[in-house]
Amino acid sequence: MQAKIIQFLKQADGYVSGEEMSQQLNMSRAAIWKYMQELRAQGYEIEAVPHLGYQLVASPDKLFPHEIQFNLNTKLIGQKIFSFDSLGSTMDEAFLLGMEGTPEGTIVCAEGQTKGRGRLGRVWVSPKGKGIYCSLILRPKLPPTQMPQITLMIAVALAEAIKHKTSLQPTIKWPNDLFIGSKKLAGILTELHAEVDQVKFIVVGIGLNVNALSSQLLDTATSLKIETKGALNRVEIFQEILRSIELWYYKLLKGHFDEVLEYCRENSATLKKRVRVHDPAGDVEGEAVGIDIDGGILIRRDSGSIIKKMAGDITHLR
């Protein structure tokens, strides 16, 4: 009911009388007053004037589902959202939901994470209320061999959303990080549950530093606030990310991975650099010369031979 009241206030042009809300929402004016008190306690600034009614003045900087879904206008991504004040990891929660059959497009987000993680078990620093920490459940009818394409697609969608909202152009460090200059802005973690040649579901985790200060991040990281020199509305950023993911996900499902590749190649932080790819099968060092049609990175070794890596931890050497 709180969500309905907020939506009612957002759509109103000016003040809304308690009587009108009572009739439209089919509840007593006393119940409406009670909900208003609860919403104020959550951080909503609601003005009440005798004989005029209620008016929403400001919303809190919180990733509430009803805030994210208001005017989201997606068909799949974000139609169901689980929001938490704090979680160990949104990835773990989303994976459990995936196992339970939760619909594709479901989002798990948290204001903060106590055990946020990146690739290879690394810690993802998640200062509370300063970033977007979320995991998305996808159920694409694709073979497991195409999963690297999902990671790159999410990277492109995230970069496009950031550019649209801030005019910043992030570069993509293959396969899963976004950078501004030499500093990391966002990371992507993809985990899948598959049987033989069939993907049951994928969980895509996103960590984006939005309003974090330098003192709250590692020396190698940055945030949108640091780069733009101003605080940003996390809900608006999150909405743009979800819209962008839906757009690029549908492109991928329709066989247009070439558009993802083109974007990655044009905005790569890795290509033309000397790199080392760490892999259990053995490290590979050389120049990153391309991204293959299946999303793998092409490395030209000093011998002149070219090897493709589909996964691995990559280090930029120069």
Task: Please provide the spans of the model-predicted regions.
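Conserved active-site carboxylates
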Residues: 177
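Long, positively charged amphipathic alpha-helical accessory segments at protein N-termini or as interdomain linkers
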Residues: 1-28, 37, 41-42, 143-146, ...
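A local structural micro-motif
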Residues: 47, 170-171
